Amino acid sequence: MHTLYCYVDGSDNQTVEPVLVDAFRALVSDWAQYRAVLVNHQHERTPDMAPDDLSDWFIGLNLPLPHVSRSLIDQLVLFTKALAGVTARDFVVGISSPSGGSEDLVFLNANADASEGSRLYTKLEATLHGA
């Protein structure tokens, strides 16, 4: 099953982790009927990383695609816009496939507007239907 993801874009999240996690936890709770899942996963450091390199850190949510609607997309855009304003972070929304592949569809920030929801929904539909 394909999954929609929405994660903070970047790995320098130490100072804003509590705000991000609390906000996404609340949204996941509101979207429990859609089987939304909170994600807060920081990858282990690897030997090839320089001392000042940050390991990948995914903070956000996953949502099974059968449950994604235009209304949820619009809510997600408003949510990320507000959270970007509070945290000064951008967000990436994309789709992952059961085979493990993923495709980033849009990047959202504090300036996101209703057109971003339309663009995201159009890209989502095109990706799912092979257009």
Predicted segments, located by residue:
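Charged interaction segments
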Residues: H43-A131
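A common structural junction motif
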Residues: F24-R35, K81-A88
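Short, extreme N-terminal segment that most often corresponds to the first beta-strand
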Residues: M1-A32
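Short, glycine- and small/hydrophobic-rich beta-strand elements in well-ordered beta-sheets
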Residues: D30-T46
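Generic alpha-helix signal with a bias toward terminal, lower-confidence helices
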Residues: P18-L20, N40, V92
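Short N-terminal secondary-structure initiator segments
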Residues: M1-C6, H41-E44, G94
